[in-house]
């Protein structure tokens, strides 16, 4: 039996891949645009 290695930290996750971080850069905005187009219910972490 293998142990779960992903702990998950809310603050770190938001700082790396949150909505405001995505909107800062051109490529980040492209990510949001693509996810909107695909109809994702959650655009960012």
From Swiss-Prot:
Where does the source fall among the domains of life? Bacteria
- Comp. bias (Basic residues): 10-45
Q: Which gene is this protein's source?
A: rpmH
Q: Where is this region: Disordered?
A: 1-45
* Gene3D superfamilies documented for this protein: 1.10.287.3980
Q: What are the alphabetically sorted keywords of the record?
A: Ribonucleoprotein, Ribosomal protein
The beginning of the lineage is:
Bacteria, Bacillati, Cyanobacteriota, Cyanophyceae, Synechococcales
Q: Name one GO biological process term.
A: translation
Record-linked PROSITE patterns: RIBOSOMAL_L34 (PS00784)
- Protein name, UniProt field: Large ribosomal subunit protein bL34
Task: Please give the organism.
Answer: Synechococcus sp. (strain CC9311)
């Amino acid at each position: 039996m293998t142990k779960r290695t992903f702990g998950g930290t809310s603050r770190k996750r938001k700082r790396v891949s949150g909505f405001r971080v995505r909107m800062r850069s051109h490529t980040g905005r492209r990510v949001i645009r693509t996810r909107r187009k695909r109809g994702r219910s959650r655009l960012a972490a």
